[in-house]
Regions:
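Active-site ligand-binding patch in enzyme domains
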Residues: 2-51, 55-134
């Protein structure tokens, strides 16, 4: 049993089906639901929302965890994107509010070693740049 055993996603649409996988370890791609592909020179956004589109709850600390229910699949996707990102963009309010999961290890601690090795192989750096929007 590994830290990825409780994460099994399913790819619904693969718009980049002709593009090559970025080369993640097999267990990470299996948890993702297949090959992980990204187009070059694009900005990717990832956040959770409630059924009515709310992405943050006023006055609730770590409201995204409240909205997502702390689902390991959501944390896994966040970690995966951070493992391959050049930069993570965060608002200054979020930065001031709490220490966030700016790295893959922070987003999905159970997979820290796997994501750390994947990032080193793909990006060649320990962590993405943190870009703060003010």
């Amino acid at each position: 049993m590994t830290e990825l055993d409780d994460v099994r996603l399913e790819t619904l649409v693969d718009a980049l089906g002709d593009a090559a996988s970025i080369g993640l370890p097999a267990d990470i791609e299996a948890a993702y639901g297949g090959p992980f592909r990204l187009a070059d020179r694009l900005v990717y956004a990832n956040f959770v929302t409630s059924i009515d589109g709310v992405a943050a709850l006023a006055g609730v600390e770590r409201s995204s965890a409240t909205i997502s229910g702390g689902a390991s699949a959501d944390r896994f996707v966040m970690a995966l994107l951070r493992a391959v990102a050049d930069a993570v963009v965060v608002g200054v309010g979020t930065l001031r509010e709490h220490r966030g999961p700016w790295t893959a290890e922070g987003a999905f601690p159970a997979g820290a070693d796997r994501f750390r090795r994947a990032r080193a192989a793909i990006a060649g750096t320990e962590a993405p740049t943190l870009a703060v929007v003010t």
